[in-house]
Structures are given as structure tokens and as C-alpha cells.
Swiss-Prot record:
Taxonomy of the source species: Eukaryota, Metazoa, Chordata, Craniata, Vertebrata
Secretion signal span: none
Zinc finger (C3HC-type): 102-156
GO MF annotations in UniProt: protein kinase binding; zinc ion binding
Post-translational changes noted in the entry: Phosphorylated. May also be weakly phosphorylated on Tyr residues.
Modified residues (Phosphothreonine): T28, T84, T333, T384, T387
Keyword set, alphabetical order: Acetylation, Cell cycle, Cell division, Metal-binding, Mitosis, Nucleus, Phosphoprotein, Ubl conjugation pathway, Zinc, Zinc-finger
Localization (cell): Nucleus; Nucleus envelope
Pfam family, one: NuBaID_C
Gene: ZC3HC1
Biased composition (Low complexity): 371-380, 407-422
Annotated tissue distribution: Widely expressed. Highly expressed in heart, skeletal muscle and testis. Expressed in brain, placenta, lung, kidney, liver, pancreas, spleen, thymus, prostate, ovary small intestine and colon. Weakly or not expressed in leukocytes.
Name of this chain's protein: Zinc finger C3HC-type protein 1
Organism: Homo sapiens
Motif (Nuclear localization signal): 396-402
Comp. bias intervals (Polar residues): 52-72, 327-338, 351-360
Length: 502
């Protein structure tokens, strides 16, 4: 009885071995693929990563099947490619060869007029030779536009899977996203406080930004802050510093924001989220200096601007530039008594005079300054005949210089210009160009409708924001409305304009 059992067991074993031999050709490619993955895949991926890669390869048949979904659909990766197109490397190109179009197909700049694919590492020379023949120039532009797709390697995914068009467009068809991004930009700009740039009233009139429009936008921001959580609502309060809020509101409408990645650099920089342009505010007139000049010229030191008297004591956020850091240290050496005796208009004006003035009289050396009342070695050397130890509070020459520096020819006014929110963008930026909505793009339109007025992107966003506010405007009003506050700010702008023109 034992022999049949042993025979059956032998037959079963032979059948198993034969089945294994039969199935071995089917399992060999999978085994080889696993061995290859063990040498290429990172160790922290583990077994799950190998199984996922094997599954994607068995289904799609390509190891790069999931790469397009990770890089071409990433908005952060898209704008990181756009950021490589600096003005030195990519200049003088038409709109159809803008960095937004090049980054859509995976290109970055490595040298002047030299593109490189971020995936297949292919190179493309995009130089435009100066030509007097306009047709030849247009032909060259068309060739380069076509080469953005054809210059990739054979198995590169960018020609078949470019980034979405919406990355390089303003979301004009989605008002909720516009309002949310508008509030985020406003909150980030308010962190700069008095370091925000001063705006010229003529530029605001050119942009058709009236007091009523600014008031509606401030009401919209206040309503959106009320809908946010309490943690985010405490960061910004619209009850104080109305001049800062009006400036931040105008800049955020035009697409400017204070990037969070720049806070560690301790610099007052604002950036555009579309053209990735960064602007240092130390090169422009700032609210801090304008308020100081305004108070000194109109005698407003005894009656401060509403909203500033309740400000908590704050440390200076960041020095505007290395030059401002040195001038701040020079101001600390001067005593308040001497400054009051000399009737200085303000610390900002004195800093600018001591550093930027072309006259050698207005350039005191840092080691010559002392905490005590200053002497007059410079005026004595010019022939006044004073003794070195004689202490005088001021001199006629200094008074004359200070009166002249309050005019429009002062170094502070001439060296620092006003910030224009629209002209600081790059010429291909969607904020200053005519932007098509999603419906127009889906219909295949490349030009705006002739019946609709041609408006730049920031003005289209402004129209949508105002319409969104007017559609949901509440009936109740505050005791001191924001429109009244904004009119006070514009009155300050007009006074400052008359100050600069005197």
C-alpha cells in the first residue's frame, strides 16, 4: 500500500516541477526587471516603490510614464523654469517666444539666447539676428516657435505633454480664486509696513484708481478677512495705518506681493507671481520718508495721521539697503538736542543729506560725529574765522542748505523715483498684457474680442473684484467708513505732490 502512495507523490512532484519549468519563461522578464530596479531605485523606496514602478512599466510600457504628471503639471516647477529667464539671458523676444511659452514646453535658459530642456537635456539656440526684412524676421520667429516642440529628443515627453495654458494666465473666469489671491498678496505686503513705496497721484489718475474704487476694494478685503479663521484674521487689522493699507491694496491689484522666501534675506523686496520680477524698494521713495517730509513741511508733527497714534512700538523690519544701514548708524551718533537746535525736518532727510548730497559740507565723516554738540571745523576752514573749540548750534550756511534741500531739487527727490505699479512688470507679463479668458482659449481664439475693450490684466482683475464686491455689498456702514479714510490718504498724496513741486 505504501508503493502507490510513493508513486502518487512522485507524480505530483514531477507535475509541480514541470509547471515551474513551463512558467519560468513568463517570470524571467519580471525577475530581470526587478534586478535592474534594485540597482537603480533608491533604497528608501523599499518594496512598495519597486512594485509601483513595475506596475507602471507593465501597464504603460515606459519608465518615464509618470514623469510628465509630476513635472509638466506642477505649477511650482513651471514658475521655477520661468524664473531662469532673466533680462540678461532673454531679451528682445516677441510675445510668442515669451518665457511663459518656453517654460510651457520644459525649456530653461542656461546662457544668453540658449535654451535647455529640463528633461532630455537638449539644447536650442534661439538667437534672433537683426534683420531689416520684417518677413524674414517673422519667419525666424515662426521657426523658433515650432522648434520649441521639435527640438526635444525622440523620447522626450514635453512635445506631447506640455504644461497647461492656465499656468501663464490670470484666472479671470474664477472670481473666487482672484479674491483669495488678492487677499494673500495684500496680507504679505502689509508686513512691509512703512517700507512700502510711495505712489504718485498722477500714476493713480492714469490708472483710473479713484477714492471710491479703493474704498470698495478695502471693504472687500475687510469682508474676506471676516470669513477667514481667527488665526489669520489677527495678522491684519484694517483699523490702523490706512496709508499702508491703501498702498498695499493698489500694489496687490497690480499683482505685486512680498514673497515669503525673501524674509530670511532681510531685504524689502516685492515680487510678481507671473513674470517673477523682483524689485528692491530701497531704490524708490517710501512711505516712511514721505510721511516724515510731509510732517516737517506742513507742521503735522503735533497732529499725527489718524491710525498712527495707536500703533504698537515696533522694531524696524529690515534696513532698506546697506547704505541705509550705514546712515542709520550715523544718525544714532547725533544728539536730539543738536538736531532740534538745527531745526532738521526729520531723520530721513538728514540721513539723505549727509550721504547723498554732492556738497562736501554735507558729508560729515562717521568718526567726526560725537554725542555732544557739534563744532564747525568745516565752516572755519572755509574762511569764517571761528575757533575750533567754539560751539555754535547752527550756521547761516547750514540753514540755507536745509531750506534749499526742501525744494524739488533735493537729493532725496532726485535720487529716488516713485514706484509705478504697472511699468515695473516685464513687457510679457500677463498683468500688463491683454489676457484671454478660459472660454476664449477653449474656442481657439488668440486675439481679444473686438467688441470688448482691450484691457490689461490688472484692469480686468480690478473690474472683476469691483463687480464681486458690488454684487455682495452690505447695506450697513461703519461709523468711520473706509471711503473717508481713503480720501484722507489721497489728500496726503496731493499735499505731498505740492511739496515735491514747490
Amino acid at each position: 500500500m505504501a508503493a502507490p502512495c510513493e508513486g502518487q507523490a512522485f507524480a505530483v512532484g514531477v507535475e509541480k516541477n514541470w509547471g515551474a519549468v513551463v512558467r519560468s519563461p513568463e517570470g524571467t522578464p519580471q525577475k530581470i526587471r526587478q534586478l535592474i530596479d534594485e540597482g537603480i531605485a533608491p533604497e528608501e523606496g523599499g518594496v512598495d516603490a519597486k512594485d509601483t514602478s513595475a506596475t507602471s512599466q507593465s501597464v504603460n510600457g515606459s519608465p518615464q510614464a509618470e514623469q510628465p504628471s509630476l513635472e509638466s503639471t506642477s505649477k511650482e516647477a513651471f514658475f521655477s523654469r520661468v524664473e531662469t529667464f532673466s533680462s540678461l539671458k532673454w531679451a528682445g523676444k516677441p510675445f510668442e517666444l515669451s518665457p511663459l511659452v518656453c517654460a510651457k514646453y520644459g525649456w530653461v535658459t542656461v546662457e544668453c539666447d540658449m535654451l535647455k530642456c529640463s528633461s532630455c537635456q537638449a539644447f536650442l539656440c534661439a538667437s534672433l539676428q537683426p534683420a531689416f526684412d520684417f518677413d524674414r524676421y517673422k519667419q525666424r520667429c515662426a521657426e523658433l516657435k515650432k522648434a520649441l516642440c521639435t527640438a526635444h529628443e525622440k523620447f522626450c515627453f514635453w512635445p506631447d505633454s506640455p504644461s497647461p495654458d492656465r499656468f501663464g494666465m490670470l484666472p479671470l473666469d474664477e472670481p473666487a480664486i482672484l479674491v483669495s489671491e488678492f487677499l494673500d498678496r495684500f496680507q504679505s505686503l502689509c508686513h512691509l509696513d512703512l517700507q512700502l513705496p510711495s505712489l504718485r497721484p498722477e500714476d493713480l489718475k492714469t490708472m483710473c484708481l479713484t477714492e471710491d474704487k479703493i474704498s470698495l476694494l478695502l471693504h472687500l478685503l475687510e469682508d474676506e478677512l471676516d470669513h477667514r479663521t481667527d488665526e489669520r484674521k489677527t495678522t491684519i487689522k484694517l483699523g490702523s495705518d490706512i496709508q499702508v493699507h491703501v498702498t498695499a491694496c493698489i500694489l496687490s491689484v497690480c499683482g505685486w506681493a512680498c514673497s515669503s522666501s525673501l524674509e530670511s534675506m532681510q531685504l524689502s523686496l516685492i515680487t510678481c507671481s507671473q513674470c517673477m520680477r523682483k524689485v528692491g524698494l530701497w531704490g524708490f521713495q517710501q512711505i516712511e520718508s514721505s510721511m516724515t517730509d510731509l510732517d516737517a513741511s506742513f507742521g503735522l508733527t503735533s497732529s499725527p495721521i489718524p491710525g498712527l497714534e495707536g500703533r504698537p512700538e515696533r522694531l524696524p523690519l529690515v534696513p532698506e539697503s546697506p547704505r541705509r544701514m550705514m546712515t542709520r548708524s550715523q544718525d544714532a551718533t547725533f544728539s536730539p538736542g543738536s538736531e532740534q537746535a538745527e531745526k532738521s525736518p526729520g531723520p530721513i532727510v538728514s540721513r539723505t543729506r549727509s550721504w547723498d548730497s554732492s556738497s562736501p559740507v554735507d558729508r560729515p565723516e562717521p568718526e567726526a560725529a560725537s554725542p555732544t554738540t557739534r563744532t564747525r571745523p568745516v565752516t572755519r576752514s572755509m574762511g569764517t574765522g571761528d575757533t575750533p573749540g567754539l560751539e555754535v548750534p547752527s550756521s547761516p550756511l547750514r540753514k540755507a542748505k536745509r531750506a534749499r534741500l526742501c525744494s524739488s531739487s533735493s537729493s532725496d527727490t532726485s535720487s529716488r523715483s516713485f514706484f509705478d505699479p504697472t511699468s515695473q512688470h516685464r513687457d510679457w507679463c500677463p498683468w500688463v498684457n491683454i489676457t484671454l479668458g478660459k472660454e476664449s482659449r477653449e474656442n481657439g481664439g488668440t486675439e481679444p474680442d473686438a467688441s470688448a475693450p482691450a484691457e490689461p490684466g490688472w484692469k480686468a482683475v480690478l473690474t472683476i473684484l469691483l463687480a464681486h464686491k458690488q454684487s455682495s455689498q452690505p447695506a450697513e456702514t461703519d461709523s468711520m467708513s473706509l471711503s473717508e479714510k481713503s480720501r484722507k490718504v489721497f489728500r496726503i498724496f496731493r499735499q505731498w505732490e505740492s511739496l515735491c513741486s514747490c
